[in-house]
Amino acid sequence: MVSKIIKLGVPTATLAVGTLLLGDDEKRSAFFRTASAFTQNHGHKTFDEHFPRGEWDKNWDFRDPISLVDKGKWEKADEEGKKKLIEEKKATATRNIFLIRHGQYHLDHEVKMLTPLGREQAELLGKRLANSDIKFTNMTMSTMVRATETANIILKHLPDDLTRTSSPFIEEGPPYPPVPDHKTWRPLDPEFYTEAARIESAYRKIFHRASPSQKEDSFELIVCHANVIRYFICRALQFPPEGWLRMSLGNCSLTWITIRPKGHVSVRSIGDIGHLPPNKISFT
């Protein structure tokens, strides 16, 4: 507590010493009144000195309307024409991306197929999605066996006409050298170099605001792997990518990320396993 007070500056430290002579309620009231006043006068500067923060990149997906305008048309257009060109490129729909981790699988098996528990987890998730009253737009699944098995079990509970595709780009792999290092899991640099490029490519393909031609909100299912999902979360929120390994995701967990028309990104849930009873939860 003392070290935090010192970091906030002398006026706050002086206040803290003075409040030692007051009762508990009086201490809290006096401290926060003065701390509030101090923050209003010095808050942003003081806070930023000790907790540096980066700016949000508004054009993180390079789909800001002006980025999509044809340069030739832009140069020839007058002011009204430029406004019209920008308006035509504005997104109006919201994209909802549901990242699903596969079910529990046999770690020691060459094919790494789902265990009986993993299949049961996928069934329970499929039922949850079917009862959600959400009209899902499409599903993309990793080509690895455990993800494909999970996706196919889920699909039994969803409409037959749901568009589905497979992608090798969202297969499991090391997305970025983690900080801190893992004690036992240490891929070689060449593996990071190649796999990180693949997973980053998948991120750029999947995560972006809606196309101007998309008129309705979309609800997209992505069935893949823990490393990939955790990296996607960091990138989507513009968090340091080296922090991806600090999160843990259960099998058949659900992560919901929303991308709004202006490019604002928000996370509605991370690793949600509310559809699994306690005895069906696993993290393998």
Swiss-Prot record:
The organism of origin for this protein: Caenorhabditis elegans
Protein name: Serine/threonine-protein phosphatase Pgam5, mitochondrial
Entry-linked SUPFAM superfamilies: Phosphoglycerate mutase-like
Gene giving rise to this polypeptide: pgam-5
SMART domains recorded: PGAM
Localization: Mitochondrion outer membrane
Record text on subunit structure and interactions: Interacts with skn-1 isoforms a and c.
Gene3D superfamilies: Phosphoglycerate mutase-like
Record's bilayer topology term: Single-pass membrane protein
Family: Belongs to the phosphoglycerate mutase family. BPG-dependent PGAM subfamily.
Gene Ontology cellular component annotations, sorted alphabetically: mitochondrial outer membrane; mitochondrion
Documented EC number(s): 3.1.3.16
